[in-house]
Amino acid sequence: MTLRLFDTETRALRDFAPLAPGHASVYLCGATVQGDPHIGHVRSGVAFDVLRRWLLAHDYDVAFVRNVTDIEDKILNKAAEAGRPWWEWAATFERSFTWAYQQLGVLPPSVEPRATGHITQMVEMMQRLIDNGHAYAAGGDVYFDVRSYPRYGSLSGHKLDDVHQGESAGECKRDPRDFTLWKAEKPGEPSWPTPWGRGRPGWHLECSAMAEFYLGAAFDIHCGGLDLVFPHHENEIAQAKCAGDDFAQYWLHNGWVTMGGEKMSKSLGNVLSVPNVLKKVRPQELRYYLGSAHYRSMLEYSDTALDEGAAAYRRIESFVMRTQERAGEVTIGRWTDAFARALDDDLAVPAALAEVHGKVREGNIALDGGDLEGARAIASQVRAMLGILGVDPLDEHWTQETADASAATDALDVLVRAELERRQTARAEKNWAVADEVRDRLIRAGIEVTDTPNGPEWSLKAGQ
């Protein structure tokens, strides 16, 4: 395995050489749990899940950390607007994100730390920064002195002279570009004690402290969305380096999901929530779609593109399932060399999928020609490749989902048929009011009823 990854900091493809042979340490900036996840949020989870699976497939021991930002201005503001405690608001949407990742078959992280659980580590890092002359306390706040770090801007390419003032003007700042490590206590906001007064952490400090705590002063890969390069990741580097850490050796960033050429964003109002999209397609089809573009590319959303992605996945799935039906059990084999070359080339999933589809065409020819053993051998290869991409249709995650859905449908069938029998009885008695009331209630529940010569049949409306 010679895995090459595009490192944002050096702007070049680099051979992956872990700090410890056979071990890989990865930090992914997770969710700020201010609201329901949209498909732009979960793209990073899907993209870097493929990286993790590829490392695991090559027998790496992978420590994968994905944090939860559960204290932040937007969380506090939205909770206050809704009249709910901030911690309840954060916990509610943390569960929403966990559900979304689980639905899409994203492997759970090795650890998923919350910012509020690591205040001690943040205070310790701030103390080191102050002791090293890179931070200062003023008016209850603590600021990072950007001029004290000559390499500020190395990740993003921003020159310090071109950087505008930080997130707030801050009357106590030495330089308007200095950013906040710690925010002084405000009435009605949560706060924690520090040597510089009560307050709460700044967003950038949270990730640096948690990455160091779980992965050490130096670790292999830091991942996140392209929008995090500046200022978030730039500030993470500055904090960590000035606190004495070597920090991340590789920086990987995924592109956005866009609509009409604009980044999907709550502030723009152009978001598609994961639950709503899952009314249109199955979870594995959404995952396939989100993962089908190169992780560094922008993914322009449209209903047509989503439908095409779902149809492409169903063609692959159909081959695997038909083969298992006709040729017997399809075990997981070995991926092809072309597939491996694609993923080793900066996780080039489009090229990897081209190989998968080529194998599916080859397998369908074998299957239709009666070469069952040949078809089964190809299906085994396809399963291996799909497993790395997280969409193997015979994987327990997806088969259990199908079984659960089938059980739910069976239970629903019992209830609906009881209502249909009630409707049939009412019609036989010419009690049209009751018959219409049953029909209308089923329609409101998203159930369509078709009267056939063999009696009424029901189905869920599309998107239910």
UniProtKB/Swiss-Prot annotation:
A motif ('HIGH' region) lies at residues 31-41. One of its GO terms (biological process) is cysteinyl-tRNA aminoacylation. GO terms for molecular function: ATP binding; cysteine-tRNA ligase activity; zinc ion binding. It holds the Pfam family DALR_2. Its EC number is 6.1.1.16. The keyword Zinc applies. The keyword Protein biosynthesis applies. InterPro entries: Cys-tRNA-ligase, Cys-tRNA-synt_Ia_DALR, Cys-tRNA/MSH_ligase, Rossmann-like_a/b/a_fold, tRNA-synt_1_cat_dom, tRNAsynth_Ia_anticodon-bd. It catalyses: tRNA(Cys) + L-cysteine + ATP = L-cysteinyl-tRNA(Cys) + AMP + diphosphate. Zn(2+) binds at C29, C207, H232, E236. A motif ('KMSKS' region) lies at residues 263-267. Keywords: Aminoacyl-tRNA synthetase, ATP-binding, Cytoplasm, Ligase, Metal-binding, Nucleotide-binding, Protein biosynthesis, Zinc. It is an enzyme of class 6 (ligase). Binds 1 zinc ion per subunit. Disulfide bonds: none annotated. Its cofactor is Zn(2+). One of its GO terms (cellular component) is cytosol. Belongs to the class-I aminoacyl-tRNA synthetase family. This is Cysteine--tRNA ligase. The gene is cysS.
